[in-house]
């Protein structure tokens, strides 16, 4: 059953395109917006526009940052361990490790994993950027690259691919410990489990 309002139906269809959002949830969100004050709806509209216009990838680590704030605050941060780079799949994974308050090194965000079935190859993720970063003068301070990808088939494939590229550089490549459920995404793992996985990492 469809609404008689084409505007509401259009909004429902757009919400339903978001990950994890079905039609029923899209309907609830649409009804919520319909009942909100115009000023609140305008704030949401502005936030959606801003995130596309003002957010960029950090020129160093590829994490998200604002235009005019590049490199990002983590890459510029004082007190970070410059000898370690933790390689993750997506920006939410950076937040997950930062919440543990245990890891104080740097990061590199791949923005995906190698997945031939989905048509995603090594050139489609930020592997070249990692290699270029390590070849720069600042990159020569790095003694360990920690592979912290989700324990999926695609994640493991990416870990193996990247580690083979890095080993000739003389950099120690490690992987976070098992204990994270197979198929789980790091952004949904609790801080204690992530801390143990980081502490128990092994050399590849």
Curated annotation (Swiss-Prot):
<dbReference type="Pfam" id="PF13662">
    <property type="entry name" value="Toprim_4"/>
</dbReference>
<feature type="domain" description="Toprim">
    <location>
        <begin position="83"/>
        <end position="181"/>
    </location>
</feature>
<keyword id="KW-0233">DNA recombination</keyword>
<dbReference type="InterPro" id="IPR023627">
    <property type="entry name" value="Rcmb_RecR"/>
</dbReference>
<dbReference type="Pfam" id="PF21176">
    <property type="entry name" value="RecR_HhH"/>
</dbReference>
<comment type="similarity">
    <text>Belongs to the RecR family.</text>
</comment>
<dbReference type="GO" id="GO:0006310">
    <property type="term" value="P:DNA recombination"/>
</dbReference>
<keyword id="KW-0863">Zinc-finger</keyword>
<keyword id="KW-0234">DNA repair</keyword>
<protein>
    <recommendedName>
        <fullName>Recombination protein RecR</fullName>
    </recommendedName>
</protein>
<feature type="zinc finger region" description="C4-type">
    <location>
        <begin position="58"/>
        <end position="75"/>
    </location>
</feature>
<dbReference type="Pfam" id="PF21175">
    <property type="entry name" value="RecR_C"/>
</dbReference>
<dbReference type="InterPro" id="IPR034137">
    <property type="entry name" value="TOPRIM_RecR"/>
</dbReference>
<comment type="function">
    <text>May play a role in DNA repair. It seems to be involved in an RecBC-independent recombinational process of DNA repair. It may act with RecF and RecO.</text>
</comment>
<dbReference type="InterPro" id="IPR000093">
    <property type="entry name" value="DNA_Rcmb_RecR"/>
</dbReference>
<keyword id="KW-0479">Metal-binding</keyword>
<dbReference type="GO" id="GO:0003677">
    <property type="term" value="F:DNA binding"/>
</dbReference>
<dbReference type="GO" id="GO:0008270">
    <property type="term" value="F:zinc ion binding"/>
</dbReference>
<keyword id="KW-0227">DNA damage</keyword>
<dbReference type="InterPro" id="IPR006171">
    <property type="entry name" value="TOPRIM_dom"/>
</dbReference>
<keyword id="KW-0862">Zinc</keyword>
<dbReference type="GO" id="GO:0006281">
    <property type="term" value="P:DNA repair"/>
</dbReference>
